Amino acid sequence: EVIPPNASKELGRVFSTARGEGFRFSTRYSHALGDASRLPDATLAYRLPFADGVRSLVGQAYGGEITTHTGKESLYAVDFTLPEQTPVVAARGGTVVEVKDWFAEGGPNPDLLDKANIVTVQHGGGSTTQYVHLATNGVVVRPGQVVTQGQLLGYSGNTGYSSGPHLHFAVTQAVVYPDGTVHQDSLPIAFYAFNPSFDKKCFKNELKKKK
């Protein structure tokens, strides 16, 4: 079931059948951002998640040597090697649904797995994009904010479980597993290697010159 933003839903109540006597209980739950009932557009191409003109080496990606992207949540993620404080921009427009920018520590320590600064943007079709390992206090957007493709989200860093300054970028989709639990699985990513609107303008200018 999808819970709308800024909403809550009571899932159940726990009470003792023997008044005055002690009791114990445990709970188990799972959740994921997005909508598992909707299918993302598999033909969509994303812009690179950093400012135009910036050059980056791919440190890790699907199809190459994999060192840490072994789970379904990161199988198709791409690690872009970037100097700290490099501008990070939205690869696709959407709504910011998650922001963390208060973590300061980073390094190749598994204890830091959940201590990376992150921005998550939700899109139509139920998918999200994740921008991870951002700089401390390096996020310039807030939850609920609508962003456009290419808009500044923050600055790259080296927070959390990280072997060096880079941007971990992933497109994810909420998926319901056979056991009923919900997970955030990564999806294959296609990038376009040019600015479509800019390319069209250049193409039109070239046609005018030829005439």
Kindly give the residue locations of the regions a language model identified.
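Solvent-exposed, conformationally flexible loop/turn segments
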Residues: V2-E10, K200
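Acidic, glycine-rich catalytic/binding loops that coordinate metals and/or anionic ligands
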Residues: Y46, L57, N109, V139-T148, ...
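Structural recognition of the beta-strand scaffold that forms the well-ordered cores
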Residues: L57-G59, D79, V88-A90, E98, ...
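Active-site loop architecture of trypsin-fold serine endopeptidases
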Residues: F103-D111, S156-H168
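Short hydrophobic beta/alpha edge segments that flank linear recognition/processing sites
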Residues: V119, V147-G160
